Amino acid sequence: MKFKSQKIAFNFFAFSMLLLFLQIVYGYIMGFARIGMDGLHEWIPFNVARATHTNLLVVWLLSGFMGAAYYIIPEEGDREIEWPWLAQIQFWSLGVVAVSAVIGFHFFYWEGRKFLEIPRELDYLVVINVLCFIANIGVTL
């Protein structure tokens, strides 16, 4: 790595791999439930597994994209990320969103709309997160 700020990307990549693993686990849970082997149905109903599975996909893709940008942009711009502290805050807030959403799904705290299940408060945090990302990358370029 040429720049110290590229180490921020590792957090995003590691988080993406964890979420991908969890998404695969929830996919297996749904697959087994589909063929009638739903021993976990009392603890993880199918609708909760589907909501979690779908939202994990969105978050790990978002995290992976942000990590890739934080790795590539310093090399392309030949300079450090302008606000590495903002990238760290952004990483932790994305983690809070992901964990809160998954826990919320298991306690039936969601909006109930198809593919837009996370609560409105977390939607706002995701928007703020993406705006911080755009600002950080824009200032760096």
Which functions belong to the PLM regions below?
Residues M1-I8:
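Cytosolic juxtamembrane amphipathic/interface segments immediately preceding
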Residues F3, G31-R34, L116:
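Short secondary-structure boundary micro-motifs
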Residues F10-I35, F46-G77, P84-F108, E121-T140:
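Hydrophobic cores of alpha-helical transmembrane segments in multi-pass integral membrane proteins
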Residues L40-I44:
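Solvent-exposed, non-transmembrane regions of integral membrane proteins
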Residues Y109-P119:
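Inter-helical loop and helix-membrane interface segments of multi-pass membrane transporters/permeases
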